[in-house]
C-alpha cells in the first residue's frame, strides 16, 4: 500500500486577481516557494512532494501521520497569504491512492469555494506496513543527442513530449510520472515490474526515438525508495550492468536515520 496526500491551495485563482491581478513574477515565485516548503516539510519526515500544477501538489507520505499533516498545514497558514487543504488516501497503486484523496477533497466543495478552507481529512486509513516503489527515469545521453545539438527550447520541448508519453504509459499501470528537472522523471509505480518498464520503454523508443533507462527502488518511505532508485540508475549510468532497468529493494527491518533538517520550520 502506498499513501498519497493531495495538497490544494484554497480559493487560489480568485486570490491572484483580487483586488487586481497580481504581478506574474511574484505569483511564480510564491508558487515555487510553496513547492520548496512542501518538499522540505514532508521531506523532513521522509516524504516526497511533486509540484504537478503548483496550486495542486501531490506528495507520497507513507509513515507521516495526521498530526504532522496538521502542523505542516498550520505552518503554511502562518507564513503565506493563503491556506491549503489536504486529503490523504492509501491504495495498492499510486494512481488509485491519489484518486481517492482527490475525491475526498472534492467532497468539501470547489477549489475556488470561498467557504472551503483548510480541509484535512483521510479517505480510508493510514499505511502502517505499506511500501513505496519509485522509478527514477532519465533519457539516454541527452547531452550528446539534444543539449549540445539543439536549441534550449527544442531540447525542452523534446523532454516535455517524452514526459507526456511516459505519463500516459504509466497511467495504464495505475502509476504516475513527474518531471524532476533536467531529463529526469520520478515515477511512483507500486505494482509494476522490470518487464513492464522494458515494454513501456520499447514503445516510447518506437514512437519517439527517445531511449530511456530506470533505477527502481522499493522502501518503507518515499525517501528510502527514491534513494535506492537513484543508486540503481547510477549503476546503469556507470556501465556496471547491461540492464536497461535495475531494481533495488530495502532489506526487511533496515532503517536509515536522517540528519535533522534545520531548514524545515516544523
Swiss-Prot record:
Q: What is this enzyme's catalytic activity, as reactions? A: GTP + 3 H2O = 2-amino-5-formylamino-6-(5-phospho-D-ribosylamino)pyrimidin-4(3H)-one + 2 phosphate + 2 H(+)
Pfam families named among the record's database cross-references: GCH_III (PF05165)
EC number(s): the record gives 3.5.4.29
Q: Which GO terms describe its biological process?
A: biosynthetic process
**Keywords attached to this entry:** GTP-binding, Hydrolase, Nucleotide-binding
Quote the InterPro entries the UniProt record gives. Answer: GTP_CycHdrlase_3, Nucleotide_cyclase, Rev_trsase/Diguanyl_cyclase
Q: Does the keyword Phosphoprotein apply?
A: no
**One function term, GO molecular function aspect:** GTP cyclohydrolase IIa activity
PANTHER family per record: GTP CYCLOHYDROLASE III
The free-text function statement in the UniProt record for this protein reads: Catalyzes the formation of 2-amino-5-formylamino-6-ribofuranosylamino-4(3H)-pyrimidinone ribonucleotide monophosphate and inorganic phosphate from GTP. Also has an independent pyrophosphate phosphohydrolase activity.
Family stated for the protein in its record: Belongs to the archaeal-type GTP cyclohydrolase family.
| Protein name, per record | GTP cyclohydrolase III
Q: Identify the species of origin.
A: Methanococcus vannielii (strain ATCC 35089 / DSM 1224 / JCM 13029 / OCM 148 / SB)
Lineage per the UniProt record = Archaea, Methanobacteriati, Methanobacteriota, Methanomada group, Methanococci
Amino acid at each position: 500500500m502506498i499513501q498519497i496526500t493531495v495538497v490544494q491551495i484554497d480559493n487560489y485563482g480568485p486570490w491572484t486577481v483580487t483586488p487586481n491581478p497580481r504581478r506574474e513574477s511574484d505569483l511564480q515565485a510564491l508558487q515555487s516557494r510553496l513547492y520548496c516548503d512542501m518538499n522540505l516539510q514532508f521531506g523532513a519526515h521522509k516524504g516526497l512532494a511533486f509540484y504537478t500544477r503548483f496550486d495542486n501538489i501531490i506528495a507520497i507520505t507513507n509513515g507521516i501521520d495526521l498530526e504532522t499533516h496538521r502542523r505542516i498545514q498550520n505552518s503554511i497558514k502562518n507564513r503565506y497569504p493563503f491556506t491549503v487543504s489536504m486529503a490523504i488516501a492509501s491504495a495498492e497503486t499510486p494512481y488509485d491512492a491519489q484518486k481517492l484523496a482527490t475525491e475526498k477533497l472534492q467532497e468539501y466543495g470547489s477549489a475556488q469555494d470561498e467557504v472551503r478552507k483548510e480541509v484535512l481529512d483521510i479517505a480510508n486509513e493510514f499505511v502502517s506496513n505499506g511500501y513505496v516503489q519509485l522509478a527514477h527515469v532519465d533519457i539516454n545521453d541527452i547531452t550528446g543527442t539534444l543539449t549540445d545539438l539543439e536549441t534550449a527550447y527544442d531540447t525542452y520541448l523534446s523532454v516535455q513530449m517524452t514526459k507526456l508519453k511516459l505519463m500516459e504509459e504509466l497511467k495504464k499501470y495505475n502509476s504516475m510520472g513527474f518531471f524532476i528537472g533536467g531529463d529526469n522523471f520520478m515515477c511512483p509505480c507500486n505494482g509494476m515490474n522490470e518487464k513492464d518498464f522494458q515494454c513501456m520503454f520499447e514503445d516510447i523508443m518506437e514512437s519517439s526515438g527517445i531511449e530511456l533507462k530506470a533505477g527502481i527502488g522499493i522502501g518503507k518511505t518515499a525517501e528510502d525508495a527514491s534513494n535506492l532508485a537513484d543508486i540503481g540508475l547510477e549503476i546503469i549510468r556507470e556501465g556496471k550492468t547491461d540492464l536497461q532497468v535495475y531494481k533495488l529493494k530495502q532489506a526487511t527491518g533496515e532503517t536509515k536515520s536522517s540528519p535533522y533538517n534545520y531548514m524545515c520550520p516544523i
